[in-house]
Amino acid sequence: MIKPKAGTRLIAAEACLLLLNHGWAVYPKLSSILIYPSAFRVQREELQADGVVKSSEHHVLGESWGNGRVILSWDDVKNGATDFTDGHNVVLHEFAHQLDAESGTTNGAPPLRHNTYKSWSKVFTENFEDLRERSRRHQTTVMDTYGATNPAEFFAVATETFFEEPHQLYDRRPELYDELCHYYQLDPRNWHRKGATHAAGTLSE
């Protein structure tokens, strides 16, 4: 059961983590948040390698649209808040997409200071390609391999990992971690005692 006041406070609190040390407007494009009780189904059209467009059904935990609409599964919002050290948080993920969209397109490059674009592009491209390769090899990594889908998902998954598993991300992808520290203007390692988090399986990174 969704309790409206508690639910909106929880979502707002987690979404505002991404803005803590920034002087930005508070999600200027955000227009609405739709909450479903649990994971929901959507129809998506995908272009196949042979040029044929195929429609398929997907179960999703959340969505973020460039027009400012965010959709969330309440079950997964609660799960993310219950364990803030597992690297999975649908609120952080979808609101990272909202930040990304502020540049005019959702492509893994949110609005940045002019002198940081070159470094951001280099580090994110290298780490994205590395995650794609590890995903193809079915290797366990500190980041969820859903981030290998495209650059936009890479940024959203990197944001989840940055806030929830900062020590692990720093140990295995230090340059990526530093870029996220500069972007978000904070260091979540100060919030998490090292060794308190856990990782599923043995990481190959």
Model feature map: region roles:
Residues 9, 27-29:
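Short, basic and Ser/Thr-rich N-terminal targeting/leader segments
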Residues 1-4, 149-150:
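Intrinsic-disorder/low-complexity, polar/charged segments
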Residues 31-33:
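Extended, charge-biased low-complexity segments
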Residues 12-21, 25, 40-85, 102-205:
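Metalloprotease/metallohydrolase-associated module, dominated by Zn2+-dependent proteases
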Residues 35-39:
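A general secondary-structure junction signal
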Residues 87-90, 94-103:
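Catalytic glutamate of the conserved HExxH
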Residues 3-14:
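Short, structured protein-protein interaction patches enriched in aromatics and acidic/basic residues
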